[in-house]
Amino acid sequence: MNTWNELTVHVNREAEEAVSNLLIETGSQGVAISDSADYLGQEDRFGELYPEVEQSDMIAITAYYPDTLDIEAVKADLADRLANFEGFGLATGSVNLDSQELVEEDWADNWKKYYEPARITHDLTIVPSWTDYEAKAGEKIIKMDPGMAFGTGTHPTTKMSLFALEQVLRGGETVIDVGTGSGVLSIASSLLGAKDIYAYDLDDVAVRVAQENIDMNPGTENIHVAAGDLLKGVQQEVDVIVANILADILIHLTDDAYRLVKDEGYLIMSGIISEKWDMVRESAEKAGFFLETHMVQGEWNACVFKKTDDISGVIGG
């Protein structure tokens, strides 16, 4: 009987995405996030904390490694690499690593206990694929299988991206999703009325996972998934481009985004830690965009830029 090692990292919430990616890089076959912020009794309002709910800055990220890997060596490697995160301006807090052994049957279902249906925005609720869930009036359901942890919709950067899509999509738009990951933003765009969505990711695994998630959601045949390096080689002009990726990468796509976004169209960017916000804003404005909306949740920033000659509705206009 095969066995697995379950490793849990207790880390500051700011480091969730970076640590999740690191766990996958070191051989984990999946990760699960346990975050007190996911259990608020009310809808998330992008930064407000409700006093009746006890909150913690620390989260638990649980990863699952096959027994063919030396878990002690993995833990030592992780400890060294996590220590380096502080040097890049990413606060990890007091990191704690715990591990235990699981048999195959435990692994098959254990990680699923971390995922429950989550109301992410006013209209959008993300539901694990194995859960029976009855939509309420006006509620749009995104079915997801978070097995490879490319983003399940609960991370602040994804939440703000979804909120921004709700803000700009009115129906009939064309959308490009750069670095689609799980495909959650593309699926949301389809549910919010976009006509055609083009989803790109450099990672072949992400392309496969995105397509699998898209296939779970009826009516999403208008999403076209392909491997791609940012916007290189893309010629399709669109109404909206959305990119939830690292700030250092975002600054390399703003010129191409301006070329591809139609007049009066939008560029949505997320995944920006606060210390790099000015750098991203300057890159977008230099390309020709005007800032319309700036959102902040904790140390994460997201923004909506507009390609327009009428600056009356933009920040500072």
Swiss-Prot record:
Its EC number is 2.1.1.-. Keywords: Cytoplasm, Methyltransferase, S-adenosyl-L-methionine, Transferase. The keyword Magnesium does not apply. It catalyses: L-lysyl-[protein] + 3 S-adenosyl-L-methionine = N(6),N(6),N(6)-trimethyl-L-lysyl-[protein] + 3 S-adenosyl-L-homocysteine + 3 H(+). It is found in: Cytoplasm. Pfam families: PrmA. GO terms for biological process: methylation. Gene3D superfamilies: Vaccinia Virus protein VP39. Its main location: cytoplasm. HAMAP family: Methyltr_PrmA. Belongs to the methyltransferase superfamily. PrmA family. This is Ribosomal protein L11 methyltransferase. It comes from Streptococcus agalactiae serotype V (strain ATCC BAA-611 / 2603 V/R). The lineage of its organism: Bacteria, Bacillati, Bacillota, Bacilli, Lactobacillales. The gene is prmA.
